[in-house]
């Protein structure tokens, strides 16, 4: 399995190895959807049986390029009935021809994070991305430098739709906003632990790009003033937040393993769903929490760490993460702004 961290942990792979003695089970974790997809394009379609990436790629690239294959609806559709309401008929799990091409599991709203002792949740949700353009916030925030996400979030801050082409005057607007966001930041780092530490010790009051995934370890350690925020409104159909949802799909390996779909079924089990949610030092909700058998495995502190109290509401205010339309041009502008 080629995956985001979590599926490669001993808590997940150990029990599967025990259940399948004699099988060789190998997992490699990546930190970029495009990089993982490029491995398949470069010939590693012969190596992997499953791929776990965020929601737009299966339908937009992997399936049209024959890098993944349909899953058995008879075998896997019943699992959707046990998921949270927002996943019961999740459109990005299906190709345009109606085939089932991936199963959702981990997910989370991903916009920005504040210290609620300094900026109230209500104010942060109300201000949305404008918070970072406020002159009083100069040098009081950090930027978590996940470049693809920064590009999306700068578009939203500039009042633009990242999933439509950004050209002409809109591109100028993106450039100005990128320069302001990067120029007025106190800290630029891709280390979420360092960012949470700076937030807790008062070095910054908020950070641009972040969410449940990055706030949860600090919250689980007791710093519940670290909170992921989803704006109440925004420039795309009234929405300003973005949500990522991982889909796990079967690679179109010419010499497939019959254990691939067994593993996909295995991670739906309550105790394995819980292990996927809480592993490797970041904690995330999973779609399987629609089942009482899964939900009952989480205690109050764990649910608080992943902000379960507001998740459904935040999801409703978020756009699905999609492929950024003008990515090549925008990443170039963004990189210059970041370096200067």
Where are these regions (language model features)?
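Short helices/loops that flank or line small-molecule/ion binding pockets
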Residues: 14, 36-48, 63-65, 131, ...
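Conserved C-terminal helix/tail region of periplasmic/extracytoplasmic solute-binding proteins
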Residues: 305-340
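Hinge/lid segment of periplasmic solute-binding proteins
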Residues: 37, 56, 60-107, 122-125, ...
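Early extracytoplasmic/lumenal segment of secretory-pathway proteins
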Residues: 1-61
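Ligand-binding pocket segment of bilobal, Venus flytrap-like solute-binding proteins
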Residues: 140-155, 162-231
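Short beta-strand->loop
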Residues: 2-5, 69-80, 97-107, 114-117, 121-123, 224-242, 251-252, ...
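Mature extracytoplasmic/periplasmic domains
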Residues: 246-314
């Amino acid at each position: 399995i080629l995956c985001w961290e979590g599926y490669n942990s001993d808590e997940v792979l150990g029990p599967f190895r025990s259940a399948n003695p004699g099988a060789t089970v190998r997992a490699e974790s990546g930190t970029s959807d495009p990089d993982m997809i490029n491995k398949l394009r470069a010939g590693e379609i012969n190596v992997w049986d499953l791929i776990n990436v965020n929601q737009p790629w299966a339908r937009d690239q992997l399936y049209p390029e024959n890098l993944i294959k349909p899953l058995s609806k008879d075998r896997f559709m019943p699992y959707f009935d046990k998921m949270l309401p927002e996943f019961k008929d999740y459109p990005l799990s299906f190709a345009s021809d109606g085939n089932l091409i991936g199963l959702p599991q981990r997910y989370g709203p991903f916009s920005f994070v504040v210290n609620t002792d300094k900026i109230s949740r209500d104010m942060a949700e109300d201000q949305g991305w404008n918070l970072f353009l406020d002159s009083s916030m100069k040098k009081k925030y950090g930027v978590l430098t996940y470049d693809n996400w920064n590009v999306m979030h700068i578009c939203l801050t500039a009042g633009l739709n990242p999933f439509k082409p950004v050209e002409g005057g809109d591109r100028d607007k993106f450039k100005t906003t990128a320069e302001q966001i990067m120029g007025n930041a106190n800290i630029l780092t891709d280390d979420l632990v360092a960012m949470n530490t700076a937030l807790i010790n008062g070095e910054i009051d908020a950070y641009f790009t972040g969410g449940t995934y990055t706030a949860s370890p600090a919250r689980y350690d007791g710093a519940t003033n670290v909170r992921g925020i989803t704006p109440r409104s925004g420039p795309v159909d009234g929405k300003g937040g973005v949500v990522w949802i991982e889909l796990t799909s079967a690679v179109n390996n010419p010499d497939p393993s019959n254990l691939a779909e067994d593993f996909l079924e295995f991670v739906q089990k309550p105790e394995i769903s819980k292990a996927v949610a809480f592993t490797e030092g970041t904690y995330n909700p999973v779609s399987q929490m629609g089942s009482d058998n899964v939900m009952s495995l989480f205690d109050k502190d764990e649910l608080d760490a992943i902000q379960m109290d507001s998740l459904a509401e935040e999801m409703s205010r978020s756009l699905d993460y999609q492929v950024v339309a003008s990515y090549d041009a925008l990443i170039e502008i963004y990189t210059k702004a970041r370096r200067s």
